[in-house]
């Protein structure tokens, strides 16, 4: 058997963070990516996305789905949270891998339909200022039903 199978789980650190009053900690969703090694995680609650800097104890609102303030973010996932630049990667491949780990998808339920929003983040965890850094996927002719979870397919 592998060594890791016999190890008890360990906790590397414990943080206490004050979250905004509108955040429901019982239903909040969290995501982390290898691209953010500086103790940054992301949280969604209601229609808002937040960046949490664990080292500084800061919670920053990054995005709100303003079309419907009662919308609920049901899922948030990075395109590839395990994507890491390898030493032998060429420059283009390395940059591509880094961007995958900084692209966050949100599955949002609003009324009777679902909306998928994809956000390109920077190395600091801010929303990129590049054109099309926030893409909203919805088609009134082919509405998405209620979203439970989202995933990425690379085929």
Language model feature labels by segment:
Residues 23-33, 68-91, 144-150:
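Repeated scaffold domains used in trafficking and secretory/extracellular systems
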Residues 1-23, 30:
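Intrinsically disordered, low-complexity acidic/Ser/Thr/Pro-rich linker and tail segments
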Residues 38-39, 98-102, 155:
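Short coil/turn segments that connect the beta-strands within blades of beta-propeller domains
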Residues 41-44, 102-109:
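Conserved beta-strand element within WD40/beta-propeller blades
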Residues 2-5, 54-58, 119-127:
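Short loop/turn segments immediately following beta-strands, especially the blade-tip
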Residues 138, 147-155:
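Short, intrinsically disordered, charge-balanced linker/junction segments flanking boundaries
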